[in-house]
């Protein structure tokens, strides 16, 4: 008689479901592994990547890690999981781009109470799509089945990106100076920040104004869900080309903390950014939040990107050319302000009408 005892599956961890997930996501990850430098396949203990010393004689590796935050709640509520993976990649690769780094590879972590194969395949497909947009390889990851840790239908995501830049091309913000112009690249909307406030204002289920499928006139025929699930724009291909053509002094990725917290991260001490409100196009979702909250303008600026996904500091005599080149590469772009000397004790970011 075979002894029958308690199994891992009895405790909520199903090995067969894990093996089936690996089979399902293999085709998605394989799409990203064509990137030069990638070695081996998914499934080894470590992901492998070989640097090219000819391209980078003095290589500096730049790393970044992030998540998607409460934007995931939109995926849970709607059952649409194929875009939050793009957000996951965007949050890290856009960060390392601010140091001038070309993304090389990406790894992901997914924590979930019970593996739902259809949901997880959608998530990984989105991660692979994001890696393709960023030109990096998805060389590894972890999907942890954690019974009792997450409510049914929910999960959390974390991502980790590594990029490379030659030492003489590293962006530290040291070159940014008063008189530099600021060029803004358009966001695709909310990106993946400020969602706790946005949900509180917009979503009826969280105490706000609308159902997911409502179409407020301000949103131009789009549903609230479509606007709030729009993935974060990945700027890698555009910005790497701008870096090759122009003397970019600094880059700020406008994420959590909005304009006021992120632009100063590229500014030397004693300098401030002066933005001209109205110089760029603000997506209508922001005015909807501002009006319905109501949310004060200062709070909006300290929470959201307000339509500026990335801001570049460049010499004033190159600003219009940089904006035009970005538009040729498919971005909406504007000259949105300048760098000035900071007032003693004054703000590092000033938004003027």
Swiss-Prot record:
InterPro entries: PurM-like_C_dom, PurM-like_C_sf, PurM-like_N, PurM-like_N_sf, PurM_cligase. The keyword Membrane does not apply. Pfam families: AIRS, AIRS_C. It is found in: Cytoplasm. Its EC number is 6.3.3.1. GO terms for molecular function: ATP binding; phosphoribosylamine-glycine ligase activity; phosphoribosylformylglycinamidine cyclo-ligase activity. CDD domains: PurM. Keywords: ATP-binding, Cytoplasm, Ligase, Nucleotide-binding, Purine biosynthesis. The keyword rRNA-binding does not apply. One of its GO terms (cellular component) is cytosol. One of its GO terms (biological process) is 'de novo' IMP biosynthetic process. It catalyses: 2-formamido-N(1)-(5-O-phospho-beta-D-ribosyl)acetamidine + ATP = 5-amino-1-(5-phospho-beta-D-ribosyl)imidazole + ADP + phosphate + H(+). It comes from the Bacteria. It is an enzyme of class 6 (ligase). Pathway: Purine metabolism; IMP biosynthesis via de novo pathway; 5-amino-1-(5-phospho-D-ribosyl)imidazole from N(2)-formyl-N(1)-(5-phospho-D-ribosyl)glycinamide: step 2/2. Belongs to the AIR synthase family. This is Phosphoribosylformylglycinamidine cyclo-ligase. The gene is purM.
């Amino acid at each position: 008689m075979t002894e029958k005892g308690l199994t891992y599956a009895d405790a909520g961890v199903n090995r067969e479901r894990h093996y089936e997930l690996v089979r399902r996501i293999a085709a998605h990850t394989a799409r990203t592994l064509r990137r030069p430098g990638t070695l081996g396949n998914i499934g080894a203990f470590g992901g492998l990547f070989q640097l090219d010393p000819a391209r980078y004689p003095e290589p500096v590796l730049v790393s970044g890690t992030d998540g998607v935050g409460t934007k995931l709640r939109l995926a849970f509520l709607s059952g649409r999981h194929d875009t939050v993976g793009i957000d996951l990649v965007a949050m890290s690769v856009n960060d390392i781009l601010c140091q001038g780094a070309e993304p090389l590879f990406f790894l992901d972590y997914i924590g979930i109470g019970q593996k739902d194969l259809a949901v997880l395949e959608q998530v990984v497909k989105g991660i692979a799509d994001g890696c393709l947009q960023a030109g990096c390889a998805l060389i590894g990851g972890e999907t942890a089945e954690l019974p009792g840790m997450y409510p049914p239908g929910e999960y959390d995501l974390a991502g980790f990106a590594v990029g490379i830049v030659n030492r003489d091309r590293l962006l530290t913000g040291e070159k940014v100076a008063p008189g530099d112009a600021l060029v803004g690249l358009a966001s695709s909307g909310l990106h993946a920040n400020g969602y706790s406030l946005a949900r509180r204002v917009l979503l009826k289920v969280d105490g706000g104004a609308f159902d997911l499928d409502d179409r407020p006139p301000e949103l131009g025929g789009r549903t609230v869900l479509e606007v709030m699930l729009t993935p974060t724009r990945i700027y890698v291909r555009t910005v790497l080309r701008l870096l090759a053509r122009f003397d970019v002094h600094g880059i700020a990725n406008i994420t959590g903390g909005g304009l006021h917290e992120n632009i100063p991260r590229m500014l030397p001490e004693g300098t401030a950014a002066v933005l001209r409100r109205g110089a760029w196009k603000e997506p209508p979702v922001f005015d909807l939040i501002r009006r319905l909250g109501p949310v004060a303008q200062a709070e909006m600026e300290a929470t959201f990107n307000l339509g500026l996904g990335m801001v570049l500091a460049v010499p004033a005599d190159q600003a219009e050319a940089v904006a035009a080149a970005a538009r040729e590469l498919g971005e909406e772009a504007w000259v949105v302000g300048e760098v000035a000397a900071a007032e003693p004790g004054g703000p590092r970011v000033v938004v003027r009408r």
